[in-house]
From Swiss-Prot:
GO terms for molecular function: structural constituent of ribosome. GO terms for cellular component: large ribosomal subunit. One of its GO terms (biological process) is translation. Belongs to the bacterial ribosomal protein bL32 family. It comes from the Bacteria. Residues 1-21 are annotated as: Disordered. Pfam families: Ribosomal_L32p. The gene is rpmF. Keywords: Ribonucleoprotein, Ribosomal protein. It comes from Chlamydia felis (strain Fe/C-56). This is Large ribosomal subunit protein bL32.
């Protein structure tokens, strides 16, 4: 098996890992109910996607 010749420093390790953090999810506004939802998914509050009713949502 391959073995590293030299040890990587902590700084080099941390610089490599600086891009590994999870990114915050963006939110869009539904055109039908004006609630925030994740883009490219069905709106969870009204059930619309791309201006069309895709699923029925039970009202509380």
């Amino acid at each position: 098996m391959a073995v590293p010749r030299n040890r990587h420093s902590n700084a080099r390790k941390n610089i490599r890992r600086s891009h590994d953090a999870k990114k915050a999810r963006h939110a869009a506004v539904c055109n039908n109910c004006k609630q925030a939802f994740i883009p490219h998914t069905v709106c969870t509050s009204c059930g619309f996607y791309n201006g069309k009713a895709v699923m029925t949502v039970e009202k509380k």
